[in-house]
Amino acid sequence: METKRLILRKFAQRDLFDFFEYASQSDVGINAGWKPHVKISESFEILKNFIASDEILGIEEKASHKLIGSVGLHLDERFRRGIASRELGYVLNHDYWGHGYMSEAVSAVLYVGFVNMHLEIITCGHYPKNDRSRKVIEKNGFKYEGLIRHHSRLYTGEIMDLCQYSITRKEYIQKK
């Protein structure tokens, strides 16, 4: 799948070094809820799962052909049972923050979710201090549902709340 500046595609083994580059950035992993990778072998193990998955796509910058992040629609049956729903997740190399890349990728993935997959609702969340993620979510038409208190425990031991959002197919179509 292509956008103006990006190619959203399956992960491949050639992505290992670019993946490790952003997975090892301390300000990237913490915002996604995982410990930054210290060894490339950690990234290799995760990359094998990404390659096998149909839920996650690599984000490649067209101009440089560099893998700069990932985006995906993940199964999430914790909150909505019997509803065609997915949870949006994404991560971006911090060198590419602030240029609209993630909003561009999310917009393309929402189209796939609602038009191709016929989803009824897509959810997304961010930790309260992650203002950049909030902006991506709101720019793409998600509505704030509320705060999920004590949502998860980080690798540091810190207990995190989660700001929860969603967008329905109807809202998506009206926005377009």
Question: Model regions: which residues?
Answer:
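Acyl-donor (CoA/ACP) binding surface of acyl/acetyltransferases
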Residues: 1-27, 56, 60-176
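Conserved GNAT-fold acetyl-CoA-binding loop/helix
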Residues: 27-48
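A short helix-loop-beta-strand connector motif used in the catalytic cores of GNAT acetyltransferases and
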Residues: 47-58
